[in-house]
């Protein structure tokens, strides 16, 4: 794959994914203004990047450790481990929004502009987790990471599949996970980290709403559980794209309807682990 022309949004996305430098990865320079014509590559070709470059300090592992029990969060190092995991989730999400800009240049510019906006918001969430991590005496790279999101999302062959997995699936599930961990961190006495998780939950509602809107536009039909399920890359199941219990209030605000949520709750369990 050849890199996009310098100074374009596509080049900014390319650099975010490919840079081996930690600081550029976690806090990249501002992108070109997507409202300007010159910010976009002329006649861009699809660039499907199989994986992101990782700085040497970010040790990647093939299998994640089990999620700590709530009582273990009274240990600051355990909280730091989880915050580091959340930071890496946000990094992957930011990279994958950039990935979709490069992979699907034929999509409406409004869609790709929205992907850039979501990418920047994920980097803001990353910065919040990074600050909380530092308050506990830890830094990015202190714990191993797993590129679980990359392993799945980079297999998406169409824009609708990307939106189905990244937006409706992974970000939808984060509505449950962020609320659950916010309660656990607060119970462990870490109200500052809980507040960050609650902020992430609120802002992810908008990300999921973007996915609902664009899944409908890309498929030409209202969001429907069966259509969403069929759009997911195999062998992924909706069973691993949710938390227990369903964050019904947040999901309804994001645009899911009650029938969709009932189908999601009834989804049979799967052998595929959703440990990231």
Residue spans for each PLM region:
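Non-heme di-metal
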Residues: 1-276
């Amino acid at each position: 794959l050849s890199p996009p022309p310098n100074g374009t949004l596509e080049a900014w996305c390319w650099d975010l994914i490919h840079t081996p430098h930690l600081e550029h990865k976690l806090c990249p320079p501002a992108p070109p203004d997507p409202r300007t014509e010159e910010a976009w590559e002329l006649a861009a070709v699809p660039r499907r990047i199989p994986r992101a470059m990782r700085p040497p300090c970010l040790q990647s592992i093939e299998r994640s450790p089990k999620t700590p029990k709530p009582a273990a969060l009274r240990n600051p190092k355990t909280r730091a481990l989880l915050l580091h995991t959340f930071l890496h989730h946000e990094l992957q999400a930011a990279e994958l929004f950039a990935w979709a800009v490069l992979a699907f240049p034929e999509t409406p510019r409004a869609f790709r502009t929205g992907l850039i906006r979501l990418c920047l918001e994920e980097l803001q969430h990353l910065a919040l987790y990074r600050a909380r991590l530092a308050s506990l005496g830890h830094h990015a790279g202190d714990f191993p990471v797993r590129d679980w999101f990359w392993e799945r999302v980079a297999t998406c062959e169409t824009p609708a599949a990307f939106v189905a997995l990244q937006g409706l699936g992974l970000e939808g599930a984060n509505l449950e996970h962020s609320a659950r961990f916010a309660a656990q961190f607060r119970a462990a006495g870490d109200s500052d980290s809980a507040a960050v998780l609650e902020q992430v939950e609120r802002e992810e509602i908008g990300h999921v709403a973007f996915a609902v809107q664009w899944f409908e536009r890309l498929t030409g039909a209202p969001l429907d559980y069966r259509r969403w399920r069929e759009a997911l890359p195999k062998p992924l199941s909706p069973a691993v794209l949710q938390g227990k219990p369903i964050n019904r209030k947040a999901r309804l605000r994001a645009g899911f309807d009650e029938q969709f949520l009932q189908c999601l709750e009834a989804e049979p369990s799967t052998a595929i682990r959703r440990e990231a």
